[in-house]
Amino acid sequence: MRCPKCLLCLSALLTLLGLKVYIEWTSESRLSKAYPSPRGTPPSPTPANPEPTLPANLSTRLGQTIPLPFAYWNQQQWRLGSLPSGDSTETGGCQAWGAAAATEIPDFASYPKDLRRFLLSAACRSFPQWLPGGGGSQVSSCSDTDVPYLLLAVKSEPGRFAERQAVRETWGSPAPGIRLLFLLGSPVGEAGPDLDSLVAWESRRYSDLLLWDFLDVPFNQTLKDLLLLAWLGRHCPTVSFVLRAQDDAFVHTPALLAHLRALPPASARSLYLGEVFTQAMPLRKPGGPFYVPESFFEGGYPAYASGGGYVIAGRLAPWLLRAAARVAPFPFEDVYTGLCIRALGLVPQAHPGFLTAWPADRTADHCAFRNLLLVRPLGPQASIRLWKQLQDPRLQC
């Protein structure tokens, strides 16, 4: 009596195994057709950062730590994960995506003004470069004979002239293998002073302003990241590393270059380096700049590097842009980058030399900076003074 039962069980197990193999094979086949690879070879796998891939259904990765309650962002992410190949957040029109947010979020009217504005236009990711009325200069592409090893992509705002000049005179000053760019939106808008002619003069003088025709407000910082990734793909695809930093950061450029050049090649190819936050949760207290309503997002944040300053491998740019098309918009650029990194199956690398909450009372101690790579915030005068001290060959620590 036992033998027939054993044979029946064995037959059932073999059938289930065959079905599993078939499902995995057909799923992998659909994935390869739905997502052609970006140009070039993907970053090499490493034990900490395996080769990036983009699942046909992103919920296989994002859904592991993001629950599916009634929060709007979570619902949108699951919808994006099931879209057909080629569809993204702009499918059906980016304004339509924003209008849906206003109608589907029951307490949308109670959201802070900036968050409401973000949601109404968050899916709009295609903006032309902006040329000042005074005839500013377009930023040149990276030439085949002059590809930067490290691109310094610094987020700024039109009126922060002193901060940009301080960067030019200090850690962003000309050096072999270094190129400096500032990322700005349009200086036109929101009842401020007319900065058009001043920005035009600055653009002609330095040719280092990447300007786009969108309103430069805090919740558009994610947009700057996405437009930079697209610009890199068209104009500087072979850059080795990209530092994305705020204009009030101070970077010990020689120390950062030394660290990057010492990295093992496999690690360098998929690098996402900075001051890493893990197991962070949304702030639920209304009134703060990082307030997130429960009706918008539920769950914890992914591991991410602080938006004050971090480094990515240049080879990751097309992969991040590809992932971003299938990750629902989020108002904080560092968290959003962390979501895209996780969608690619990568993890951030923490470095103790990145400190984005530097205490003001330590600024006078220039020796404290010898082993650091990036700190913020520092004002223009403090940055210039510190840079001169660090360049002094007589410096004793």
From Swiss-Prot:
Residues 33-58 are annotated as: Disordered. Residues 39-53 have a biased composition (Pro residues). Its EC number is 2.4.1.-. This is UDP-GlcNAc:betaGal beta-1,3-N-acetylglucosaminyltransferase 8. It comes from Homo sapiens. Residues 1-6 are cytoplasmic. One of its GO terms (cellular component) is extracellular exosome. Highly expressed in small intestine, pancreas, spleen, bone marrow, lung, throat, and ileum, and weakly in fetal brain, cerebellum, heart, liver, tongue, breast, uteri, and testis. Not detected in colon. Differentially expressed in human tumor cell lines. Pathway: Protein modification; protein glycosylation.
